[in-house]
Amino acid sequence: MFEIKKICCIGAGYVGGPTCSVIAQMCPKIQVTVVDVNEARINAWNSDTLPIYEPGLKEVVESCRGRNLFFSTSIDDAIREADLVFISVNTPTKTYGMGKGRAADLKYIEACARRIVQNSNGYKIVTEKSTVPVRAAESIRRIFDANTKPNLDLQVLSNPEFLAEGTAIKDLKNPDRVLIGGDDSPEGQKAVRALCAVYEHWVPKEKILTTNTWSSELSKLAANAFLAQRISSINSISALCEATGADVEEVARAIGTDQRIGNKFLKASVGFGGSCFQKDVLNLVYLCEALNLPEVARYWQQVIDMNDYQRRRFASRIIDSLFNTVTDKKIAILGFAFKKDTGDTRESSSIYISKYLMDEGAKLHIYDPKVPKEQIILDLSHPGVSEDNQVSRLVTISQDPYEACDGAHALVICTEWDMFKELDYERIHKKMLKPAFIFDGRRVLDDLHNELQVIGFQIETIGKKVSAKRIPFASSCEIPKFSLQDPPVKKPRV
């Protein structure tokens, strides 16, 4: 059996970095080199301040960096020396041309394929780690075949990641499953067995699933679509709960005890974010449309539509509760990452909520324990989010949550950081304007509602009526749909 002794991973991001760090730690006899064109990112991986925040990641990197784990910008050299090359580059949603706003942009995948074939000789296994459309491996293989040379044998596998940001190290060390897809040919199965042997250093054989390449690629899209679907499903029920007086947490607990349903991903919130869910569902929608399956496409599009609706509904609820206007009102935004235990802000609901409130003239004071000020400003300065000097006029980045809440009309929790449960809310209430509102978009304060009401807060939370004093405005503001993938629309100057 072919033995993998050297691994190269192209892409030092949220997938490539943690994945290869764990492989290096679990396989001390395998040399793992993570490469990237971004020199600053590689320098960060080689420093004490890693470019991404992930619980446990720093300890893993420090245990094997310089021994059998290396980070480099010497991409061609790493490819030439490797027995196996992981492709772990970004596959963003297209923002132009055919499939704009839905199809995956594979330009980085194509660039990797061309670079690999240019710098390879002999036998090498090339493995998709990035989330890709079905039959992307066939496109890679066509590039290899068109640029073949004597004695070159490149085998293409699919090995999608299923880690979740915030629990990536735990997920990598104890995965629910490892999925490897390859050709049914003898050469393809030889490559599959070689990659299986790498994972068998720490993953039980029964958890390593092998399929054909296309099933593996589709399984990744389907898995993310199913998870996003569950979130949108419970969020749809949260709207019904708010209208009827039911509590979505109680409903989720009741249905989650049914073993056929289960209790995971039934946490109502302001909406899902991150780099994968929306991108992969939209990719699935586009795939269905391209294959003339419009009914299937419409079914999955509704998952995205419901997520957009939940964000708009939450922002509208904030505006309604604050006497139907937030113009020039200070509002504290607590949390900017798309979920706790990560510094990733991609498709974060905080961006959308901030955009809707800025459009109404609110003055936002934003705090997040792990997202740098520069990243927040960059996200909110996106041409589709804000206009001209809107961010400089309306956004302040706070150093701590108390500073953000000082003098605020309301505080809005957009990320479920554990620290927000431990804040001194009596201190916060004294410094806020009255009535003081809390809008809990992640239901992190459920156990504190009685205490907070005694202090004097007006509480609005997802999927539950809490404050009886809320004034419903008949002319509730209608917030238009918005996507980070939309081209910016310039409003005419008056």
From Swiss-Prot:
Coiled coil: none annotated. Residues 88-110, 466-494 are annotated as: Disordered. Gene3D superfamilies: Cytochrome c1, transmembrane anchor, C-terminal (1.20.5.100), NAD(P)-binding Rossmann-like Domain (3.40.50.720). Its EC number is 1.1.1.22. UDP-alpha-D-xylose (UDX) acts as a feedback inhibitor. It binds at the same site as the substrate, but functions as allosteric inhibitor by triggering a conformation change that disrupts the active hexameric ring structure and gives rise to an inactive, horseshoe-shaped hexamer. GO terms for biological process: chondroitin sulfate proteoglycan biosynthetic process; gastrulation with mouth forming second; glycosaminoglycan biosynthetic process; heparan sulfate proteoglycan biosynthetic process; protein hexamerization; UDP-glucuronate biosynthetic process. It catalyses: UDP-alpha-D-glucose + 2 NAD(+) + H2O = UDP-alpha-D-glucuronate + 2 NADH + 3 H(+). Pathway: Nucleotide-sugar biosynthesis; UDP-alpha-D-glucuronate biosynthesis; UDP-alpha-D-glucuronate from UDP-alpha-D-glucose: step 1/1. NAD(+) binds at residues 11-16, 36, 41, 89-93, 130-132, 165, 276-279, 346. One of its GO terms (cellular component) is nucleus. The active site is at residues 161, 220, 276. It holds the Pfam family UDPG_MGDP_dh. It is an enzyme of class 1 (oxidoreductase). Belongs to the UDP-glucose/GDP-mannose dehydrogenase family. NCBIfam families: NDP-sugDHase. This is UDP-glucose 6-dehydrogenase. The gene is UGDH.
